[in-house]
Amino acid sequence: MYQMNAKMHFTFVFALLVVSFNLDVLGKNLKYRIYEEQRVGSVIARLSEDVADVLVKLPNPSTVRFRAMQRGNTPLLVVNEDNGEISIGAKIDREQLCQKNLNCSIEFDVITLPTEHLQLFHIEVEVLDINDNSPQFSRSLIPIEISESAAVGTRIPLDSAFDPDVGENSLHTYSLSANDFFNIEVRTRTDGAKYAELIVVRELDRELKSSYELQLTASDMGVPQRSGSSILKISISDSNDNSPAFEQQSYIIQLLENSPVGTLLLDLNATDPDEGANGKIVYSFSSHVSPKIIETFKIDSERGHLTLFKQVDYEITKSYEIDVQAQDLGPNSIPAHCKIIIKVVDVNDNKPEISINLMSPGKEEISYIFEGDPIDTFVALVRVQDKDSGLNGEIVCKLHGHGHFKLQKTYENNYLILTNATLDREKRSEYSLTVIAEDKGTPSLSTVKHFTVQINDINDNPPHFQRSRYEFAISENNSPGAYITTVTATDPDLGENGQVTYTILESFILGSSITTYDTIDPSNGAIYALRIFDHEEVSQITFVVEARDGGSPKQLVSNTTVVLTIIDENDNVPVVIGPALRNNTAEISIPKGAESGFHVTRIRAIDRDSGVNAELSCSIVAGNEENIFVIDPRSCDIHTNVSMESVPYTEWELSVVIQDKGNPQLHTKVLLKCVIFEYAESVTSTAMTSVSQAPLDVSMIIIISLGAICAVLLVIMVLFATRCNREKKDTRSYNCRVAESTYQHHPKRPSRQIHKGDITLVPTVNGTLPIRSHHRSSPSSSPTLERGQMGSRQSHNSHQSLNSLVTISSNHVPENFSLELTHATPAVEVSQLLSMLHQGQYQPRPSFRGNKYSRSYRYALQDMDKFSLKDSGRGDSEAGDSDYDLGRDSPIDRLLGEGFSDLFLTDGRIPAAMRLCTEECRVLGHSDQCWMPPLPSPSSDYRSNMFIPGEEFPAQPQQQHPHQSLEDDVQPVDSGEKKKSFSTFGKDSPSEEDSGDTSTSSLLSEMSSVFQRLLPASLDTYSECTEMDRSNSLERRKGPLPAKTVGYPQGVAAWAASTHFQNPTNNSGPPLGTHSSVQPSSKWLPAMEEIPENYEEDDFDNVLNHLNDGKHELMDASELVAEINKLLQDVRQS
């Protein structure tokens, strides 16, 4: 028994795979066996493994799902949809499920999803019995009465034990406890049940023993074996002479299963020869018959009629075995027994049964499928059955309703209902189908079952507008929120698939979003205005309305175009654009000689409205009582109606009305003042009027304005470039003194050749050289500080320059010339000297130039160009040029410290070669007079004594004094002459008049250098200058540094010359700058290098200090500059 229980804890399953019919939708029939009473959840099989050979043929076997099509509310077996795992869903009791049927199985169908590639598997699970029940007797004590006269071999049927198990687990045998008088025999009924009969094996003697108690045991053959027992209580009665007897010991009766209740099955006829009570018989069922017999049949106890008490069913019980007994009423009656076997005859009494299994949940009579599914889509599984046997149980199944569906048999009595066409819910949403099952019995029985197929909606229809374009009109000046129209789209889909939402697609009108003009109700498509429409602003609004359904997963849309026309209203008055109006009045000029028909003017007006509302007409409403003027109502041209000469008036005021043709009419009134002029004046006035009447072209105004701005900018750029170019030219002159003073502060650079045009001579004043520091502390030194430093030296430099001018003039006066000076101030002395020079009261002494320096110093000067503060003036700065070299000591400083003592002998005597030397040579250096012989006469040609740079001059001393100044007069480059001047180095062109011109030019050059120092170096001294002079002065001050000689243009030499080269006795006479004036003498040359002899070398610093402390009077710079420039111009021209 315990071994059997152990087996029940595991699943004993085997599968029988049967290849089914050759149908595409049918995979296999699968059979499995399990024992009953298995634990819930126990796995029976996995379809994904068992039908892998079928699934592999599908397009996507990994995505296949399984669904069980079972009957009943509580399935005993469940199927996992993912892997097809079959497991126990509820407790399975075979005795309850199948009772005493030998074959007990659970059948259901499994389909694969999706249904496009449907596969049907028929599953049959056989439930095997386990010995879980013991045989049981209905009574625990069974009484039996036997007459003592019973013969040996008498059989008495005993109560049967009941065991619900089947097979070997059911009742198998009976046994009786040991005794000497009775025995039992096991017999089998027609239904397979076993029962026992008690057999008398020895004669009974009541006197010896009147009763017996024996144990009757019923046992099965299961493992473990189970049994049940009951007590037989046998009573021995006295002998009765006669006992009842049946005609037959057994009867077999054929009973049609459709026999009605009350049908007489058998008339039992038992006889008893006794009379009276001993001969009266009573019929009854034996005590051991089953309750089922008692429920189905009935026996009449007096007459012995066996009748049908309950309808029998062949499909449930095919036969019955009944034990009846007859017993008289006498004492010690012995009952007689008879066996009746009733065989139920099958008749076609059962109609076929139809069961429809639907894949979708819900009511059994409704199947749901989606529209658009392909052909052969699974709809339902139909199973038919008939309890009858033979032809009565053979069924023919049919499908009626619509050709879009078909019925396909799978196996036995199972059918599939499939789609035979693609369904469209919008055409037909529901189908009523009828399944008819008919057997082949006689007469034939049939069953009809109806069910409904509903088509589920999918979002396969976009919203649909009745028209692709809607046109509506609305008047302008509407109120905001005014209703315009409604556009409607229909969607035949259901639910959210057919729920339409309306929107206006984004677009722009005049830069504004369409949603600022119109809006639409998303639910019903009603369109409303959001603003006041103006026909003049926009006459037509076009936008797109989108209808979108609420389908899922993809929403479908459709569009329609809405054209909204704005109807014009007469809401704009005419506007006059010509002639030009002021205060709604225009002045019109008419010539006096205008004849009749003369065109006076045309009134031009516009109306922003359109159509009839914009059609204008003109009329004169006042001021034309005498019909002097006529007006064309359409063109609005005004003409004279009479000759103006005959009109006595000179002025009219005409009131002209311009009105449109709208409803209501709008008008504008203008006043025309007509004035008659004489012809010439009127022509001008008319022309001006016509010009004034011409409309201004905005584009032309913009073009003219841009052109004027560009022209002004161009002029400013040209002026700026010209000024910058002039400043460059001014600052490109080469300044020897500055270059010399800055030489030692620069690193050695490659030498380059200098040019004449790059040199500007700077005079030495009283033997002093400008060898002060010329450097700034930093490149960013303040210009204000620079001006302050320059201003602090102004008086000192001016005083020096005046004294130098006196010296120059004195050196050029002959020895026999009596010089009387007032010595009032340096300025007055200069004025007197210049006057004498101008009158030609002396002959200049010769001055030999160009041989002032030794060969080594000349070579040093040749290299000076690479340290120049100015470029050459021929373009961009050249390599080696330095426009702003500061902080260098002059090479002259080095020369001053070298050969000063070499010019004298050890005993203090002057060498013969230097007999002409003076004390000033010790300060300024040796001049040409030191070694050159004097000229025979003042008019002698001294040019033969000139030293030309670059030539060997063996007679010249090897060491020259380094302090001799280079005062070279350079012929102006911009003079109109093409000849080259070598006057800088003492060489001139071989022209007859060159001597005088050269003298004049030399003097002016030296005067220019001197008078440059007279110019003020701060802004304070220019307060009386003109604005232009001040600007020029500021521009010139940009180049030099503090304590330097200010570099001015060459023309500044006229600063003193033009003022003092006049007749001192007649200051009112014309200046020398004119041709009629007395020309300055050209017979003299300046000698800038000569200074008074009373200056010693040791007194050099004292001289400088004395000059710094000196005070002098400033001159009017503006007048001097103007007159000197005139003088230079005249000199150059001569």
Swiss-Prot record:
It is found in: Cell membrane. Residues 868-877 have a biased composition (Basic and acidic residues). It comes from Bos taurus. SUPFAM superfamilies: Cadherin-like. Residues 28-699 are extracellular. Residues 721-1134 are cytoplasmic. One of its GO terms (molecular function) is calcium ion binding. It holds the Pfam family Cadherin_2. The lineage of its organism: Eukaryota, Metazoa, Chordata, Craniata, Vertebrata. The chain crosses the membrane at residues 700-720. Residues 1-27 form the signal peptide. It comes from the Eukaryota. Residues 28-137, 138-246, 247-354, 361-465, 466-576, 582-697 form the Cadherin domain. Residues 768-800, 868-888, 941-1003 are annotated as: Disordered. PROSITE patterns: CADHERIN_1, CADHERIN_2. Glycans are attached at residues 103, 269, 559. GO terms for biological process: brain development; cell adhesion; homophilic cell adhesion via plasma membrane adhesion molecules. CDD domains: Cadherin_repeat (cd11304). Residues 892-1134 are annotated as: Interaction with DAB1. Potential calcium-dependent cell-adhesion protein. This is Protocadherin-18. It is a single-pass type I membrane protein. Interacts with DAB1. Residues 791-800 have a biased composition (Polar residues). Keywords: Calcium, Cell adhesion, Cell membrane, Glycoprotein, Membrane, Repeat, Signal, Transmembrane, Transmembrane helix. The keyword Calcium applies. One of its GO terms (cellular component) is plasma membrane.
